[in-house]
From Swiss-Prot:
Organism, scientific name: Mus musculus (Mouse)
GO CC terms: nucleus; transcription regulator complex
Keywords, ordered alphabetically: Activator, Disease variant, DNA-binding, Homeobox, Nucleus, Transcription, Transcription regulation
Main location: nucleus
Stated name of the protein: Pituitary-specific positive transcription factor 1
């Protein structure tokens, strides 16, 4: 392989310690001219020149997103940038475009501000975490006490807020398996639902209690009063309202008690007569069959 001598039109001056301060350095070839002229290099240089903001590190997908496990996993992630974002397969971003667009500048400032917030981890011993865990435990206990299942809660929330709520959502919240941000949002919704559910339960219990109070206690009739009522029933099984009032005053009972006793006594008499007639009929039938 033959070697060719290097020729150039540039002039090189040997600099010593005295001349270095007086003579300026001049370079006739820029860095861009030294690179091969290809589309690949042009795209790389243009892309690198066009991007003026640093890409924040994203922990989404690398660390668990649950709270109650480790502090580093509580950091929310705003964006997930693919690995090929800065590759040469994308068209170059020109410098004048980003420099003259005020929206791009605002976007970069907002991204820097949010990236600083992303980097701040949440303390696992913070009051917010403890309050969230306490609410999740209390919610489960109160939900079971009210008689609702996780499916009931998920369907109730889905009917109001959309289909993203389900039994799985409630289960993950109670087991502390949601991200801190989503858990805080769901906490406010579940707190409102729990308040309304307890109000409905209180109204239902009040209504049931009122119905139970309307039902009177069973009245106990003494043996002497029963004998007196039996004698009156033998004389007249269907007394009038005046007769019932008079018997109630004599026996020191309420009029309604005496009236109900006569109704029950007539029903019992009717059942006895019906049973007796059926027995007599069956006996006579057997007697005829024997002949």
């Amino acid at each position: 392989m033959s070697c060719q001598s290097f020729t150039s039109a540039d002039t090189f001056i040997t600099l010593n310690s005295d001349a270095s301060a007086a003579l300026p350095l001049r370079m006739h070839h820029s860095a861009a001219e030294c690179l091969p002229a290809s589309n690949h290099a042009t795209n790389v240089m243009s892309t690198a020149t066009g991007l003026h903001y640093s890409v924040p590190s994203c922990h989404y997908g690398n660390q668990p997103s649950t709270y109650g496990v480790m502090a580093g996993s509580l950091t929310p992630c705003l964006y997930k940038f693919p690995d090929h974002t800065l590759s040469h397969g994308f068209p170059p971003l020109h410098q004048p475009l980003l420099a003259e667009d005020p929206a791009a500048s605002e976007f970069k400032q907002e991204l820097r501000r949010k990236s600083k917030l992303v980097e701040e981890p949440i303390d696992m011993d913070s009051p917010e975490i403890r309050e969230l865990e306490q609410f999740a435990n209390e919610f489960k206990v109160r939900r079971i006490k009210l008689g609702y299942t996780q499916t009931n809660v998920g369907e109730a929330l889905a009917a109001v807020h959309g289909s993203e709520f389900s039994q799985t959502t409630i289960c993950r919240f109670e087991n502390l398996q949601l991200s801190f941000k989503n858990a805080c949002k769901l906490k406010a919704i579940l707190s409102k639902w729990l308040e309304e559910a307890e109000q409905v339960g209180a109204l239902y219990n009040e209504k049931v209690g009122a119905n139970e109070r309307k039902r009177k206690r069973r009245t106990t009739i003494s043996v002497a009063a029963k004998d007196a009522l039996e004698r009156h029933f033998g004389e007249h099984s269907k007394p009038s309202s005046q007769e019932i009032m008079r018997m109630a005053e004599e026996l020191n009972l309420e009029k309604e008690v005496v009236r109900v006793w006569f109704c029950n006594r007539r029903q019992r008499e009717k059942r006895v007569k019906t049973s007796l007639n059926q027995s007599l009929f069956s006996i006579s039938k057997e007697h005829l069959e024997c002949r």
